[in-house]
Each structure stands twice: as structure tokens, then as C-alpha cells.
């Protein structure tokens, strides 16, 4: 086989391997995507997956939590402060919410920092997550009905 054909074959093999490696890395990235839920009703958080375990605190409805692991009837979740606790699965909903993590989040009419200000939400206010928006923005709705866009770094739960 001429040297140029051998070189071309080597390049093709390496490109193919690199492509497979990139696909595997992307699949791994997707597999590690965070899974968020919201608390559906006032619910106790426990230190172990049992109703007989020590109750740590009570979680309010709408609070976003990150699902870490699930066992039969129980889920280990992380809250916006980083606390890891166990909750009964029946208290978790698929509805997505976010919680404001800055002193005052500015909710705007569009996903643009120069857009009209719709309202401001203070730290720890829970907002319903409506949809992803332009890069770095998210559309949310306040429980009073007002909706708009805010920067993703101003909230936790995404």
C-alpha cells in the first residue's frame, strides 16, 4: 500500500475514534444532568429514608429541590442551601420552580437587561419556571400572576 494511502487510513481511524470519544463524552454529560422537582405540599424532611427517622425541618410547597437518589417510596434531595435530606416521593411534583438566591432579582419583559422592569423578587421567593429563554435567561411566573424573564444566575433550581 502506498504511503499516502496508509497515512489517510490512519487519519480516518483517528478521526473516527475522536468522534466516538466526543459522542461518549456528550452522552455522559447528558446522563449527569441535574433533576429538579418541587415540593407539592407542606412536608417533613428526614435524616434517613423512614418516617421513624429524625425530622430535620419542614419544607414549604413549591420549594425547588434537586433529586439526588430515589429508593422505594423515598427520595434524597438537596435544597438551595445545600442541605441533603430525605422526603417521601409522594410530596414531590414534576412542576418546576426556582428560588431567588440574590437580594433582589429583576424580572424583565424580555430576556434582555435593557428590557422594561416587570417586578422585583426578593431572596427566597419561589417562582414557577415557565421556559428556558435566550442564553442566560429564564422565563418565570410569580404566584400573583406576573411573569417575565430573569438571569439564570439569580435563581437556584435549574
Which residues fall in each region the model found?
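Bacterial N-terminal signal peptides
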Residues: 14-28
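N-terminal secretory signal peptides that target proteins for export/translocation
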Residues: 1-12
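A general, composition-driven signal for non-globular sequence regions
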Residues: 7-8, 26, 31
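SH3-family beta-barrel domains
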Residues: 29-48, 55-61, 68-126, 130-146, ...
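General helical structural elements
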Residues: 7, 17-18, 108
